[in-house]
Amino acid sequence: MKLKGTTIVALGMLVVAIMVLASMIDLPGSDMSATPAPPDTPRGAPIVGGQGQAMGLPVAMQRRRGEQRAPVPALSDANGGFVAPNVQFSEAHWQGMEALPLSIELKRKLKLPLDLEGLLIDETSLNAAVSGLLAGDVLVAINGRKVKTLKKMQKETRRVQMDRRASLTVYRKGRLLTLTLSEEKNLGLAQVETAPMILPGDIMPHPYRGPCTQCHAIGTTGHITPDPDGIVLPPGPIRAGAKMPHRDRGPCAACHAIIQ
């Protein structure tokens, strides 16, 4: 039996319609059904499928057995600077004295006994100077309690902060001396500091003493740049024939504007 052309065209259109209809029906077990993307999932929480079943953890959170998370290397100050969590103290100030850790390097430079333990007194003023303390002394003890570190010094000054006087044991030129530190109201607590903040990549101005971050914070917000003490203002104008206030440094007009 021969089919007419119109019949063939009609059969073709019917087949196409059946295929389109089949593609729109989600048959059970069909591999054609699409799996919706999981919603945003909190880090570490299981991914849940459309029926509420757990589908596993995010790949980024899966760790191998024995694998540990890397420790946080540092803290940040309020302005984003790098601050090591266990940064060391570099100096302490108390009643006009400035105390430094007595390192082996300093003992050798100052020709002090290598077994001497205490804190180097770098500067004295105010009540510390009145007590007889001198720059170059080594503070050994406060009220008989040894102070081998700046942290220990702060602890011992905390004990006597409400007192009006305390005894200081110091080493000076091979002898141990006892001095009395006094204040009319109270002695207060020693204030400690770390080494100053340095810029990333700064050139080391001293012998190697371990990682820079043991003592320094890294950043740009910890000090004024340039240092105000290092700023030299231009010389002001002077009158012709004025008396020279300093030694001869060459023609006055080289530095000063001359007012007639």
From Swiss-Prot:
Placement of sequence motif MCR 2: 238-258
Residue positions of motif MCR (magnetochrome) 1: 195-218
Intervals, Cytoplasmic compartment: 1-7
Membrane spanning stretches: 8-21
Entry EC no(s): 1.-.-.-
Sequence positions that bind heme 1: 206, 212, 215-216
Region annotated PDZ, chain positions: 86-194
Lumenal side: 22-260
Top-level taxon of origin: Bacteria
Residue sites binding heme 2 per the record: 246, 252, 255-256
pH-activity profile: Optimum pH is 9.0 for oxidation of Fe(2+).
Outcome following mutation: residue 123 to A: Loss of magnetic response and magnetite formation
CC annotations in GO: plasma membrane
GO molecular function: metal ion binding; oxidoreductase activity
Further details from the record: This bacteria has on average 17 elongated cubo-octahedral shaped magnetosome with a size of 64 X 57 nm which contain membrane-bound crystals of magnetite (Fe(3)O(4)).
Domain notes from UniProt: The dimer forms a pocket of about 8 X 15 Angstroms, lined with acidic residues, which may bind 2 Fe(2+) ions.
Similarity comment text for this entry: Belongs to the magnetosome MamP family.
Record note on quaternary structure: Exists in a homodimer-homotetramer equilibrium.
Protein's name in the database: Multi-heme protein MamP
Native organism: Magnetococcus massalia (strain MO-1)
Organism placement in taxonomy: Bacteria, Pseudomonadati, Pseudomonadota, Alphaproteobacteria, Magnetococcales
